[in-house]
Each structure stands twice: as structure tokens, then as C-alpha cells.
Amino acid sequence: FESIGEIVSLLRDKDFRVSVDSLNPREIEPAVAAGAELVLSVHSGNIDVARSLGCEVVLIPDDNATLAGIDENVKKLETWGVPYRIDPVLEPIGFGFARSLGRYLEIRKRYPDSEIMMGIGNLTELTDADSAPVNLLLLGFCQETGIRSVLTTEVIHWASSSVRECELARKLVHYACAHGQLPK
């Protein structure tokens, strides 16, 4: 994507906050130089680029079905002083959904003080169902496990209100957990 730097600059000029979702250093570097604040995603194959970016990165496993590479790469990022969030990658139903939730629990156990991100769009966009209850359940899981950032999208028609749904669900589950009440 040769014009990524230009596009990021245009968005930043209009006061948008920008992240870049690429594994390719030739896209990541110009996007960050133009003002992207967050890089999704780094793993063992491209982690060296994170050292000189000067921005936060999202660390993903080398293999989505496992947590391969996470421990080694957390050590590198911490040694380099690079801020990061860990995303064990949420899998769609039928492709390892339950196991992926287990990976989030394992990451929280291994890294109790680290920021974690969940790409909930992987479930809402890939499940042909009303997204509001799906978002509520995922935000409830995030609240209970201390996952403080989610990535959602509104591409497919059944998820076209996901951002608003997540904002409402976030408030509901936060209140429920903070006050020991049912989320209603």
C-alpha cells in the first residue's frame, strides 16, 4: 500500500487518531512516520521494526492457534522499552473460539499487569447473528478479565451498530462488575 503515509497524514490533519493494521514493515514505518499511534500487529516475523517506531504495538502470537512467540517477544519489547498490548487473537465459532478464550485467560495469568486487546470483530463480523448480545458477552468477558481495549468493526450489515453497542455494553458490564449486580 504505497500511499499509506499520505493517507495517514490526511487523516491526522483532520484530527483523526490512526492505527495501522499490517505485518509489513514497508507499510508500518511510513504510517507511523505520518502519525499512526498504534501498530497492529507484531510477532516474531516483524518484531524488529517495533524497536525504532516510537509508538505502541499490538503483539500477536506467531501461530493463532497457540501462544507461540509471545513470551520471547514480550521480553524483547520490555527490554527495548516499547509499549505494547497483547492480543492472543479471538477465533470465530467453529474455528477455535473456546480455545481462543482460554488463551486470553492464560495471557492474563502470565502477564497480570500487561494490557490486553481483543479483536471482537473477529466474532461479530463472522457470525451471522444480531451483534448486540455477542458484543455484550464479549465485553463482559473483557471486564471480568481486565481486558481494557477492544477492536470492533462495522463492515457487515448485522454488525453495523457495533461501536455504539460496545459503548453501551461497556457501561453496563462495568457497572455490574463494580457494584456486584446483574447486568440489567
Residue ranges and their predicted role:
Residues S19, L38-S41, V58-L59, R85, ...:
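Conserved beta-strand positions in the central sheet of alpha/beta enzyme cores
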Residues K14, A34-G35, S52-G54, T145-G146:
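Short, structured coil segments at secondary-structure junctions
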Residues F1-K14:
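Glycine-rich, proline-tolerant flexible connector loops at the mouths of alpha/beta enzymes
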Residues G54, P61-K184:
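Catalytic alpha/beta core domains of metabolic enzymes, predominantly
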